[in-house]
Amino acid sequence: MIRLILTDVDGTLTFDRDTYNIDLDAVDLLRKVEKKGIKVGLVSGNSYPVLRALYTYFGFNGGIVAENGCIVYYDNQLKEVCERVERSLISEFENRFGVKGSWQNQFKVCDFSFYPPILKDEMVKWALDKGLYIKTSGYAVHISKSKRGKAEGVRELIKMHGLDKAEVVGIGDSSTDIEFLEEVGIRVVVGNADESLKSIGDFVMREKSGKAVVEFIKKVITGEINE
């Protein structure tokens, strides 16, 4: 039985993978599924303040995993599950490689993002030398001290709910969602997702991004999926 649905934001709740515009039809259906007793949470690389605002205005109640798994919020509890990255290293990375830090970095403490989203070999070497992990989501290059990415936060959130992973759905679009989906019982992948993510999906939807969420949630509401 599904008790919790966790969804990525960018490329999943948006209209497409190249826009920040949220598909409100997807949000509306997720609200409806909450009324049926299934909680909904957000899992993203975005900062906690950004996700907390979306979460509040969307009317969700299943919790938040922010900064690619490093910050977890549920039931008025806020936890950091990753080690913080020194701000001096963020400045050094920007200056050394000529990248631009995200405007959200000022609100982050563990996972920092940079543009353009192009990962170079010399960046990987620099990060390893500094004891950091580096990856690209396709939206930005991310630096943190977390090896498992979103998985750590998702695991903690499920624990806070007191649920088994079999009771949890995960929805994503990017290769950075692989670790996240490996922590849940039902893996849902939008139709325009990275092929590496599609390869592990239980449900690979026909529609893309937000419309794929609509496609899946309709199956949950009608009872077609909720075993």
UniProtKB/Swiss-Prot annotation:
Q: Reaction catalysed by this chain?
A: 2-phosphoglycolate + H2O = glycolate + phosphate
Q: Which cofactor does it need?
A: Mg(2+)
Q: Any idea which UniProt keywords this protein has?
A: Carbohydrate metabolism, Hydrolase, Magnesium, Metal-binding
Top enzyme class: hydrolase
- Catalytic residues (UniProt): D8
Asked whether the keyword Transmembrane helix is assigned, the reply is: no
- UniProt-listed InterPro entries: HAD-like_sf, HAD-SF_hydro_IIB, HAD_sf, PGPase
This entry's Gene Ontology molecular function terms read:
magnesium ion binding; phosphoglycolate phosphatase activity
Question: What residues does substrate bind to?
Answer: K150
For this protein, the Enzyme Commission number is: 3.1.3.18
Q: Which domain of life is it from?
A: Archaea
List the GO terms this entry assigns under cellular component, sorted alphabetically. Answer: cytosol
Looking at the Swiss-Prot or TrEMBL record, what is one Pfam family this protein matches? Hydrolase_3
Please tell me where Mg(2+) binds in this chain. D8, D10, D173, D177
Protein purpose: Catalyzes the dephosphorylation of 2-phosphoglycolate.
The Swiss-Prot or TrEMBL record describes its family as follows: Belongs to the archaeal SPP-like hydrolase family.
Protein's name according to its UniProt entry: Phosphoglycolate phosphatase
What species is this protein from? Sulfolobus acidocaldarius (strain ATCC 33909 / DSM 639 / JCM 8929 / NBRC 15157 / NCIMB 11770)
